[in-house]
Amino acid sequence: IVNVGSVSGATHVRTGAAYGMSKAALHQLTRNLACEWAEDGVRVNCVAPWYIRTRRTSDALADPDYYDEVIARTPMRRVGEAEEVAAAIAFLCLPASSYVTGECLAVDGGFLRYGF
């Protein structure tokens, strides 16, 4: 199982409290189910994207000031692509990750690790 969380579940971003709380709950559910279902051979992981270029984000990213703010907070200095999230999900479904469970993989260009 691969859940789709968000960096909002791990730190404050301007998506609102309800969104952040729901993603934090999903991250915790991932960890708990990974432990509960491990004996049955079920792995449960999560991906946590930061800014990903999609139809939903295109309007916000079209604003040069907002785009610059996103880039300034992203060590890789770019937004992610949907294919990169899909590749992370695919990895978590492959035998190559057979010993990985309970993890929330940030697909965020380093956003969660970036300090001031």
Residues covered by each model-derived region:
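A glycine/serine/threonine-rich, flexible loop-to-helix segment
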Residues: E39, Y51-T74, Y114-F116
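A conserved structural motif in NAD(P)-dependent oxidoreductases
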Residues: T74-V85
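Short C-terminal tail/terminal secondary-structure segment
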Residues: T11, A90, T101-F116
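Active-site "substrate specificity/gating" loop of NAD(P)-dependent dehydrogenases
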Residues: H12-G16, A38, F116
